[in-house]
């Protein structure tokens, strides 16, 4: 049985990486880390900027798929949030997480980063950043994920509601209402 393949000539290293990122996936799906690495080799401006702002915020990506402190394992989710909410909110989310949990591996889980991003988006101009960081620091990020699993709705909203509950705490004067 013959094997069908395409051969491309005269490609630069960057062209090969772009082709790899775009074409691979028919037989085996690329992981988000592999796709991002290929786009970096291809010198894709958006990928370079995304990785640069993430790194400037003090966080790296777990390209190898291994969770570690100060590393985002859920690369695809992070990129989705960056595109959906914009650079400013994406960086603010990273800074809040970094200050609250100091690189804790569980702080960079998809649900947590979705929830924090959703919270700062929904309550923009209403919440106290200092209070949010202080309140989050008192709760392990895995607790947020566990409580969110018992809730209903989208992952971002389930996690945001837990973050809101933590933010409000026992305070009546600093409490924010539930919004969607």
Name each region found by the language model.
Residues 2-180:
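Accessory terminal alpha-helical modules
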């Amino acid at each position: 049985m013959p094997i069908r393949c395409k051969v491309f000539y005269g490609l630069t290293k960057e062209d090969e990486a772009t082709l790899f990122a775009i074409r691979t996936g028919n037989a085996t799906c690329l992981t988000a880390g592999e796709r991002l690495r290929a786009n970096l080799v291809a010198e894709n401006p958006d990928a370079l900027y995304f990785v640069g702002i993430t790194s400037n915020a003090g966080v790296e990506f777990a390209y190898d798929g291994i969770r570690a402190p100060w590393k985002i394992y859920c690369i695809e989710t992070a990129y989705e949030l960056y595109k959906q909410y914009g650079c400013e909110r994406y960086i603010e989310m990273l800074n809040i997480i970094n200050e609250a949990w100091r690189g804790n591996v569980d702080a960079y889980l998809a649900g947590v980063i979705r929830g924090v991003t959703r919270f700062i988006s929904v309550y923009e101009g209403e919440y106290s950043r200092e209070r949010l960081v202080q309140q989050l620091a008192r709760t392990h990020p895995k607790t947020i994920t566990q409580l969110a699993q018992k809730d209903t709705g989208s992952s971002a909203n389930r996690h945001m509601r837990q973050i809101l509950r933590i933010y409000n705490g026992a305070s009546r004067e600093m409490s924010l209402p539930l919004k969607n």
